[in-house]
């Protein structure tokens, strides 16, 4: 759910 690139491991 977060903007792309917020986390390299998980994007929710």
Swiss-Prot record:
Keywords from the UniProt entry:
Bradykinin receptor impairing toxin, G-protein coupled receptor impairing toxin, Hydroxylation, Hypotensive agent, Secreted, Toxin, Vasoactive, Vasodilator
Judging by the UniProt lineage, the source's domain of life is: Eukaryota
Name by which UniProt lists this protein: Vespakinin-M
Its family?
Belongs to the bradykinin-related peptide family.
The biological process GO terms on file are: regulation of blood pressure; vasodilation
Tissue occurrence: Expressed by the venom gland.
Taken from the UniProt entry, a GO cellular component term is: extracellular region
Q: Where in the cell is it found?
A: Secreted
Task performed by this protein: Bradykinins are a potent but short-lived agent of arteriolar dilation and increased capillary permeability. May target bradykinin receptors (BDKRB). May cause hypotension.
Q: Does the keyword Oxidoreductase apply?
A: no
The organism of origin for this protein: Vespa mandarinia
A GO term, aspect molecular function: toxin activity
Q: Which residues carry this modification: 4-hydroxyproline?
A: 4
């Amino acid at each position: 759910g977060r903007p792309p690139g917020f986390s390299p491991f998980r994007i929710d």
